[in-house]
Regions:
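Rossmann-like dinucleotide-binding domain for NAD(H)/NADP(H)
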Residues: 1-54, 65, 98, 128
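A conserved regulatory-domain signal marking ACT and ACT-like small-molecule sensing domains
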Residues: 41-128
Length: 128
């Protein structure tokens, strides 16, 4: 480019067969982690949440708007069912948030439906 004090280098990305294979492995591992535990890594539109193993009871993941009183309304619905929240993570990225709760027991389908119907909640998932 001929610009003083600038050294241009190419962005290689996944431009070699080896790097393409490595990127595919990494993407597959990240998808597996999300499906098995709820871990979110390297997302451009979700906060990073790293979870390990399986909880003793049940793990529930909620994707929702990053708005006031959301976590309170979620935990109120869960407590009305007599379910204890053993552990909780809530992280946000701009206007989106993710809440992961480890519950003392598996939620009923009615509770999942109630949570899914709350304004601002985009997705509800749980693992046993």
């Amino acid at each position: 480019l001929g610009v003083k004090n600038i050294v241009c280098i190419p962005h290689l990305g996944a431009s070699t067969p080896e790097s393409e294979e490595n990127c595919a492995r990494m993407a597959a591992a990240q998808l597996r982690d999300y499906l098995e535990t709820g871990t979110i890594r390297n997302s451009v539109n979700m906060p990073e949440i790293v979870l390990s193993g399986q909880p003793e009871g049940c793990r529930i993941l909620l994707i929702h708007g990053n708005v006031p009183n959301m976590v309170s309304s979620i935990s109120a619905a869960i407590s009305r069912e007599g379910i204890n929240i053993n552990n909780m993570i809530n992280k946000s990225l701009k206007e989106m948030a993710v809440t992961v709760m480890e519950l003392s027991q598996v939620p009923t389908e009615e509770l999942i439906a109630e949570l899914s119907a709350q304004p601002g909640i985009i997705k509800v998932r749980y693992w046993r």
